[in-house]
Amino acid sequence: RKSLAEANITSKDVCFVNAHGTATHDNDKVEGIMLEKIFGQQIKFLSTKGYTGHTLGAAGGLEAAFTAAALREGWIPASAGFVQQDENIPVRPITEQTQINGSFAVSTSLAFGGNNASIVIAKD
């Protein structure tokens, strides 16, 4: 919410989220609850981590670059590696390449010890 406020936009202005998506039960559950709470169940989201693996310290920057590229190109790829919806996660990632139309996207990063960040990326 803080990153949306700092960008002077609302959740309805965001066309997709590139979620941190660690593929661990607890982290994915918390992130899914957060996505649903802020953006609603219909938010388009994916995690690009399935394409790159966890790049540790480079993850946030790499995911932000993918987010900017997707926003520029007008489409997001399917979430690679997604197999089955966890009943405790209230939102579902996209499972096929999806066209997007909007000016803003969000990339999230969740780190060990509770260091969490999100960045709003705007399309020119």
Q: What are these regions, as identified by a protein language model?
A:
Residues R1-D124:
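Conserved "HGTGT" condensation-loop signature of ketosynthase/thiolase-family condensing enzymes
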